[in-house]
Amino acid sequence: MKTELSLLDRSLNLQRYPKRAQELLQAWDAGDEYIIKYVEEELNLEDGKNILILNDNFGALSCWFSDKHNVTMMTDSFVSQRGTLKNLQRNQCNRVQLITSTEEMPQGFDLVLMQIPKNNRMLTWQLQQLRQSMDSSCPIIAVNKAKEIHSSTLELFEDYLGETKTSLAWKKHRLVFSNANASNPKTIAEAVCWSVDNEDIDLLNYPNVYSGEKLDQGARFMLEHIPSDPELRHIIDLGCGNGVLSVKAGQLNPEARITCVDESFMAVESARRNLEVNLGKERQFQFIANNCLDGFKKHSSYLVLCNPPFHQGQAITDHIAWQMFCDAKHILCKDGKLLVIGNRHLDYDGKLCRLFGEENVTTVASNSKFVILEAVKAEKSK
């Protein structure tokens, strides 16, 4: 896979995070290149400008513009943040301020660059924050694949931010130009709250959390099959999202210590709030933004709950699920269990059989769309 971004007589060595031996995906896309070309060739910025970059996937924009400008990068992704840091170090770039989506959006910028997020609610929230934080004279330039920029996308920019126009397509990407000058902008609440039908669970979701306004079908199915066992002293919810599986696990296992892990900072904060509200602040909880289970101790958990994502940013991939399964096996105690839910077509059973052994993988439940699998760590497993 290509790792050298060469553009305008400059080059950067950019790699995805975590680094894999046989990486199939590139650490930047044509959208990054389009923004770089436009800013360098059309804006003629003086050195030392203050630039805010939103949703930089693996730091291509941050690395490029930190050469001559003061860059702040804001993201909801732990993986993107860590990947950006690694690429900054790899290319010996100037210091970039890295902040998370759960922090207040800073002010005082001369230019804002944005990779448009996949989640429309996250986009709307970021546009509202830009409208409230940026001066009307500050150019805001966003990018996405042309096929993903619809009239409804531009309406969001107009409604929540200000006057908006688009560029011609280049390498199947399009730029969106806007300013924070809407005279009467629409507003959106930071969080959505609702109660889970037929469960004693109240949930709050911050903008970038999956299934923002209702419980997704997979999670609902999984709730019916979370075990209750006094031997489950430590339960990990891997890819926790809003923490609904952790809440149910905590209700069924009141003595268990629960750890919620997700790569989304907003997901981790949603889970923190939801466990404290539904289970009480006095319980033993841990909330970690992380790349899967990096840094977790071996043989430290009795049950891992997992609802793996099959995309990373805009890219569809199954390597995240595989890493989750490998990490879960590593940290499970002997006879510990990994409980996984996924769409039937994703072949998680094949992956789990390869990893845990066919005799240690069983189907707990299935319906027309989902399957729940249990993998047990046998005594001989490492």
Swiss-Prot record:
**Is Heme a UniProt keyword of this protein?**
no
| SUPFAM superfamilies documented for this protein | S-adenosyl-L-methionine-dependent methyltransferases (SSF53335)
Enzyme Commission number, as recorded: 2.1.1.174
* Pfam families (alphabetical): MTS
Name the major location: cytoplasm
Where located?
Answer: Cytoplasm
Catalytic activity, as annotated:
guanosine(1835) in 23S rRNA + S-adenosyl-L-methionine = N(2)-methylguanosine(1835) in 23S rRNA + S-adenosyl-L-homocysteine + H(+)
Q: Which GO terms describe its cellular component?
A: cytoplasm
Q: Which UniProt keywords apply?
A: Cytoplasm, Methyltransferase, rRNA processing, S-adenosyl-L-methionine, Transferase
Write out the GO MF terms.
23S rRNA (guanine(1835)-N(2))-methyltransferase activity
- Which enzyme class? transferase
Give the similarity note.
Answer: Belongs to the methyltransferase superfamily. RlmG family.
User: What does this protein's UniProt record list under function?
Assistant: Specifically methylates the guanine in position 1835 (m2G1835) of 23S rRNA.
What this protein is called in its record is Ribosomal RNA large subunit methyltransferase G
Q: Which organism is it from?
A: Aliivibrio fischeri (strain MJ11) (Vibrio fischeri)
Gene from which the chain derives? rlmG
